[in-house]
């Protein structure tokens, strides 16, 4: 009998799992809470009254949160942040490395806020791969991005390089946003990834060549002003703590928001 590939083994996931962009305020809130619980368990953050983990970048209109929905329960999530004048989350510690890509004229997007209810990469890997497939398709087909960037804990480096073909972008650093836990910057060159996967197992090749239908990719929930107020003003202090230049950028995008009330 032919030995199955490791990729085939990790991709054995039931048909009841639905990978898609969050479709409502409630699903976004569930996703933010799952990230909070996952990060709290890993000691990336301290406990907070809101029990939500989100940042200024979640308020940007181009940011997309993807979810793994298992019979109505969100069991995993990841967020994709396209580059903009507001920058990327990882600019906090990898500004030089990210700017070098920008200076080459490359279009960037960052993968962030990855969480699974199992809190362990080895067990979560099948669902993580399916989420990353949707991220990959959205980045290439909708954003027309050249690179996917991510900061990871060094202990997960093997997974990202073996299964997703990421390569190192920046060296080991402490990340203040996750209580100074260690981080590595990784990059996936979307322009060359199909060449890179040649010679790998068949399912890995399919991962990077099969395409999610465009109509499915574009289905996503856009936050209303009420949603923004709830998440970033009422439940958290995100807007009050955000740097002035980032709020100025968001104000230009959404002048209709009641900024005088939100940041008096």
Predicted regions: what they are:
Residues 88-192:
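Acyl-donor binding region in acyl/amide transferases
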